[in-house]
């Protein structure tokens, strides 16, 4: 006697408005993988074209005008104007810190004492947009590039010895592991010597 075997059927539950089990994808109300920028709850996330969550990026180019800083858990924060300018320039420097330093050193020197009391954000934006500036601008542009690249960078405004007195000056310090390295773009551009001790 012939026996008939019923075909086994399995049903897969479609995921909607939720994360995949591995936390790498998010499905919308139609069960499709989300791509692009998506706000989920209180946080913003960025998903690649294949739907995978982008994670752990000091800066991530979403389009020509928008960059994000993305944490290890995928939470994204849109970069400010100056951070975006720094990210664009750093990419043009081949994502290379030494080339970024050389770019800041090569800015055409223009002293501007009227803005000497501004902050690193102002100086950097000035330098990225105008391609010139004084020691404050040279240091600030490099500082912003190092920062968006993920380095523990500090912009320092102080004084250096000049003649029998001292002169206002700015430079950058980067802490790597337990050591602090000094980077002085203006020193290199003015004296033609290596203006850093971090390489």
Tell me what each language-model feature is.
Residues 1-87, 91, 163-173, 177, ...:
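Extracellular adhesion/carbohydrate-binding repeat motifs centered on closely spaced tryptophans
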Residues 54, 60, 112, 119-123, ...:
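General structural signal for secondary-structure boundaries
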Residues 80-127:
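Secondary-structure boundary elements
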Residues 100, 131-146:
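Active-site nucleophilic cysteine motif
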Residues 140-199:
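Hydrophobic/aromatic-rich core segments of domains that either
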